[in-house]
């Protein structure tokens, strides 16, 4: 009764093809590779943004190891809480769950330690030690 009008708008916008189009994995990887070529030409905050964007593109393309690599570089260059930090926690948890399902104790411990180090980083940032 109250939400009838909103439902009509949703269905009409979807029928018109106005819903956001997701890039396919190849396009995401291509965009990430193009950005990788620009990393050396940027510095400071712009470099961090590029590294985070590359990590994000790889994450969307389900290239978890590559996403982790670029987010870790971003965190090592700019020790602050933000997108790289939150995405790394998600990625480490994905890898930890994969290790659990494969019954790989070493990998599981590795990613638990990685998560612990991120937790320590967050404590250090909050306390102003970094």
Residue ranges and their predicted role:
Residues 37-41, 75-76, 110, 117-120, ...:
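Conserved structural position within tetratricopeptide repeats
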